[in-house]
């Protein structure tokens, strides 16, 4: 089954919370592209991972370092299994076959989506888990993990654990898998957001009626200027070539283009399959050193 990547439609970071996390506001979309993962119970009660690394060459080593070929104790799948097993010793062992395509340090939720896939598998052994217990455990593993437990898209606030499911029109896009490594913690620190109590700022914790309508109707060009990613100025200052890439996305036919997460992956949304194909070909011709993939949602 697919362990899907996500993209962010807008990512606002209004302030840093007293608990050390940053408050976020974003629309998270699951897309059709991602990792392939197969999980089965292991009778001996242990954790086994067998993975094929299909990540872009420049970032391939980042995954291998935490795979079964490196220090697996730093792998999010291993951490998820150990944490769940410590709470519920009755849980079986697992054998996981993973085809890894989602790059680390890309803003696509590659680790979080794998963790959620494993939690959903373990959840099938009821009554060991309730949905509330699984959600709490997911939030402890990673801020983006709760989103991947569900099936739909969501407006996400808090540190990533407050989810409001939303309706989004079917759409298509092109994803650029870029080689730049963006450390999430460093990117947040470069934003230099003020410290503020979570409860002190309520405005913006809901989507406007106008944005809800745009998302339902799929008018992606109307998102420009209404949804933005606060990390883009920092990312483009560190890596000006990402700003050039965004300009070309828009020049070549993308209706809306943005960095996803804290970077470095970038995507463009389009109005229809013909424009999607034309955009893909023009980007591949302009940036022959980069990897581009089609996706829909």
Swiss-Prot record:
One of its GO terms (biological process) is isopentenyl diphosphate biosynthetic process, methylerythritol 4-phosphate pathway. It is an enzyme of class 2 (transferase). Its EC number is 2.7.1.148. It catalyses: 4-CDP-2-C-methyl-D-erythritol + ATP = 4-CDP-2-C-methyl-D-erythritol 2-phosphate + ADP + H(+). The active site is at residues 6, 144. InterPro entries: GHMP_kinase_C_dom, GHMP_kinase_C_sf, GHMP_kinase_N_dom, IspE, Ribosomal_Su5_D2-typ_SF, Ribsml_uS5_D2-typ_fold_subgr. One of its GO terms (molecular function) is 4-(cytidine 5'-diphospho)-2-C-methyl-D-erythritol kinase activity. Pathway: Isoprenoid biosynthesis; isopentenyl diphosphate biosynthesis via DXP pathway; isopentenyl diphosphate from 1-deoxy-D-xylulose 5-phosphate: step 3/6. The keyword RNA-binding does not apply. Gene3D superfamilies: 3.30.230.10, GHMP kinase, C-terminal domain. Catalyzes the phosphorylation of the position 2 hydroxy group of 4-diphosphocytidyl-2C-methyl-D-erythritol. Belongs to the GHMP kinase family. IspE subfamily. NCBIfam families: ispE, PRK14613.1. This is 4-diphosphocytidyl-2-C-methyl-D-erythritol kinase. It comes from Leptospira interrogans serogroup Icterohaemorrhagiae serovar Lai (strain 56601). The lineage of its organism: Bacteria, Pseudomonadati, Spirochaetota, Spirochaetia, Leptospirales. The gene is ispE.
């Amino acid at each position: 089954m697919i362990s899907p990547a996500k993209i962010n439609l807008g990512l606002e970071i209004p302030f840093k919370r007293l608990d050390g996390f940053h408050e976020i506001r974003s629309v998270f979309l699951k897309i059709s592209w991602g990792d392939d993962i197969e999980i089965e119970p292991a009778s001996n009660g242990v954790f086994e991972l067998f993975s094929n690394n299909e990540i872009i060459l420049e970032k391939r080593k980042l995954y291998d370092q935490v795979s079964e070929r490196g220090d697996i104790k730093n792998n999010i799948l291993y951490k998820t299994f150990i944490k769940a097993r410590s709470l519920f010793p009755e849980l079986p062992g697992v054998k996981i076959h993973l085809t890894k395509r989602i790059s680390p340090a890309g803003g696509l939720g590659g680790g979080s989506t794998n963790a959620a896939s494993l939690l959903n598998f373990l959840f099938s052994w009821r009554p060991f888990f309730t949905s509330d217990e699984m959600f709490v455990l997911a939030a402890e593993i990673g801020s983006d993990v709760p989103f991947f437990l569900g099936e739909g898209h969501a407006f996400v606030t808090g540190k990533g654990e407050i989810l409001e499911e939303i309706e989004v029109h079917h759409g298509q896009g092109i994803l650029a898998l870029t080689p730049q490594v963006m450390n999430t913690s460093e990117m947040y620190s470069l934003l230099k957001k003020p410290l503020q109590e979570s409860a002190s700022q309520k405005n913006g914790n809901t989507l406007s009626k106008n944005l809800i309508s745009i998302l339902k109707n799929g008018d992606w060009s109307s998102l420009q200027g209404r949804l933005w990613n606060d990390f883009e100025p920092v990312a483009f200052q560190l890596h000006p070539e990402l700003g050039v890439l965004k300009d070309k996305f828009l020049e070549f036919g993308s209706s809306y283009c943005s960095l996803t997460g804290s970077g470095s992956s970038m995507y463009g949304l389009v109005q229809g399959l013909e424009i999607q194909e034309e955009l893909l070909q023009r980007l591949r011709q302009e940036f022959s050193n980069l990897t581009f993939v089609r996706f829909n949602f």
